[in-house]
Swiss-Prot record:
Protein name: Ixonnexin
Expression sites by tissue: Saliva (at protein level).
Source species of the chain: Ixodes scapularis (Black-legged tick)
Record's keyword terms, sorted: Fibrinolytic toxin, Glycoprotein, Hemostasis impairing toxin, Secreted, Signal, Toxin
InterPro entries named in the record: Ixonnexin-like (IPR011694)
Signal peptide coordinates: 1-21
Sugar-modified residues: 26
A GO term for molecular function: toxin activity
Quaternary assembly: Homodimer. Interacts with host PLG. Interacts with host PLAT.
Family: Belongs to the salp14 family.
Annotated function: Salivary protein that promotes host fibrinolysis via accelerating host plasmin generation from plasminogen (PLG) initiated by tPA/tissue-type plasminogen activator (PLAT). Does not affect urokinase (PLAU)-mediated fibrinolysis in the host. Enhances amidolytic activity of host coagulation factor Xa (F10).
Family annotation (Pfam families): TSGP1
Amino acid sequence: MGLTGTTLVLVCVAFFGSAAAHNCQNGTRPASEENREGCDYYCWNAETKSWDQFFFGNGERCFYNTGEKGTCLNGECHLTTSSGGPDDTGDNTPPPTEKPKQKKKKPKKTKKPKRKSKKDQKENF
């Protein structure tokens, strides 16, 4: 195999390698992964003879086989529908409640002294 044959083989390997890598890279969903639940998928790496993990891009739709749907964010499927089970936030704090509004107390009216009747006024003299 001469220099031309070796070059041709290397070009073919580079082309097919880049085509395979194009189907398996972070942020893109290969056609073969349309029905993949969650936000990650695996592609075979012939060089390392192992599976490489990749993630769908932020904003990609995701789902679980239970029927729950969501959106990928940082490699995790954040659900937009609920199964009625615990949520994925891990925060068990109840939602804040509003403090009941207090009624304003009306100021007490000062009582005016009773006017003495004429009879009472005469008795004091």
